[in-house]
Design a protein with these regions (language model features):
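Hydrophobic h-region of N-terminal signal peptides that target proteins for export
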Residues: 9-19
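A domain-start/cap signature at the N-terminus of enzymes
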Residues: 18-43, 48, 62-171
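Gly/Ser-rich "nucleophile elbow"/oxyanion-hole loop immediately N-terminal to the catalytic nucleophile
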Residues: 165-169, 227-269
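Active-site machinery of serine-nucleophile hydrolases
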Residues: 173, 180-242
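Alpha/beta-hydrolase
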Residues: 175-177, 292
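The conserved beta1-alpha1 loop
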Residues: 177-179, 315-316
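Primarily recognizes the serine-hydrolase "nucleophile elbow" in alpha/beta-hydrolase
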Residues: 252-305
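C-terminal catalytic histidine-bearing segment of alpha/beta-hydrolase fold enzymes
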Residues: 312-314, 318-321, 325-328, 332-388
Length: 388
């Protein structure tokens, strides 16, 4: 009789009291200032009444049990709910990386969010979901555009790469070389630390570059054998240039849809150093290069070697990490020997009203902001170059 009464109450009643597991996805995005979590996506079996949800219906906790503010709620439909999370340059609890000064590198923060329902909800059929009816479990972390890349390793170098869908045509290859803070063995920080990888898989860049392949290698240590930060010397393992060139050549060979006449290479800071070194080592491989705030002043011999490769340099005059003279002098000499070279100099780095460290002039590059005297933006200029 008790069982019968219970079933009758369940059928006729207005409250769902059983416990059910609901999975949710945490979504992130790479911004100029780094990667952050931006939203949570919930998928319910039942249709939720949108009017019963507000920003206080759920409590979101990070893996460190820090509160994340829910700013707004969106509905994909009545079953799929988006909790938009507060994020921004100064919202540290949203970060997906932290800076390890001892390693002098960015380190991935393991993401394990907790979601707690703090108020009752109502379904479209007017039944009530009590706040302890559902138990919520994080299913996955999805990062916009980063998830378009796959992982690989060759010649002791890990890498992430993006391959466009095959269409029977040849397409360019863009190689992005990260800075000093994105080395290591994670095989992810080189496309998480800044927009250096993801910028080229975004829709606009894909159109400009004719749906390119994108390759982002990661050095196990630093591209440089050694360098100083103040009085502190940081030491890399070796010169990775031969391994890097072997990786690039093998990657091209293994992907015959890549157009060998449209191989573009670029990087920022120490990645700018490595771009110069790679151009010198394999001057006949690349159709163009884009180098931002390079942590290196090439010798005249090296500049003579790369003079036949079109190069666009970008730097900020207020950069206190890498002297602007590296770009100024490189441009001046390359121009004097008749090279196809462009130089864009900014005073500081201000994007959408937000002021950043002036070493971040690569923000401009990755937003396709630099323009030459003919009114051509950097991406369009690079995309116009062919080796033969």
């Amino acid at each position: 009789m008790k069982i019968r009464n219970y079933l009758l109450a369940f059928v006729l009643g207005s409250t769902l009291a059983f416990t059910k597991d609901i999975n949710f996805d945490v979504v992130g995005e790479v911004f100029d200032y780094g990667p952050q979590t931006t939203k949570i996506i919930l998928k319910f079996d039942e249709q939720i009444n949108p009017k019963t949800l507000d920003t206080q219906t759920f409590k979101v906790l990070t893996q460190d049990l820090k509160d994340r503010n829910i700013t707004t709620i969106d509905f994909i439909d009545h079953n799929n709910v988006i909790l938009n999370l507060e994020h921004g340059q100064n919202i540290k609890d949203a970060n997906l990386l932290y800076w390890d000064d001892q390693k002098f590198s960015n380190v991935v923060i393991p993401t394990n969010y907790t979601l707690i329902q703090t108020k009752d909800m109502t379904l479209e059929n007017r039944k009530t979901i009590k706040k302890d009816t559902y138990k919520y479990y994080m299913k996955s972390l999805k990062i916009k555009d980063v998830d378009k890349f796959t992982a690989g390793e060759m010649y002791g170098l890990k890498y992430r790469d993006f391959k466009p869908q095959k269409d029977g045509n040849k397409h360019p290859l863009i190689i992005w070389l990260h800075g000093a803070g994105e080395g290591g063995d994670s095989n992810i920080t080189q496309i998480l630390g800044n927009r250096g990888g993801v910028a080229f898989v975004e829709e606009d860049a894909q159109k400009i570059f004719d749906t390119p392949y994108v390759l982002a290698p990661q050095t196990p240590t630093f591209w440089m054998k050694s360098f100083f930060v103040g009085k502190r010397e940081l030491v890399g393992e070796k010169d990775y240039t031969p391994d890097l060139v072997n990786l690039i050549k093998t990657y091209i060979r293994e992907n015959p849809e890549i157009d060998k006449n449209r191989i573009y290479i670029g990087g920022c800071s120490m990645g700018g150093y490595q771009t110069f070194k790679t151009l010198v080592y394999a001057p006949d491989l690349f159709a163009a290069a884009f180098i931002t705030c390079p942590a290196y002043m090439p010798s005249t011999e090296e500049l003579n070697t790369v003079k036949d490769t079109p190069i666009w340099l970008v730097h900020a005059s207020d950069d206190t990490t890498v002297p602007v003279s590296n770009s100024r002098e490189s441009f001046k000499y390359l121009k004097s020997i008749g090279a196809d070279v462009v130089y864009t100099e900014y005073k500081d780095v201000v994007i959408d009203g937000n002021k950043y460290d002036p070493h971040g002039s690569y923000f401009y590059t990755l937003h396709n902001s630099p323009i030459n005297d003919n009114g051509i933006n950097i991406f369009q200029w690079i995309a116009s170059k062919k080796r033969y």
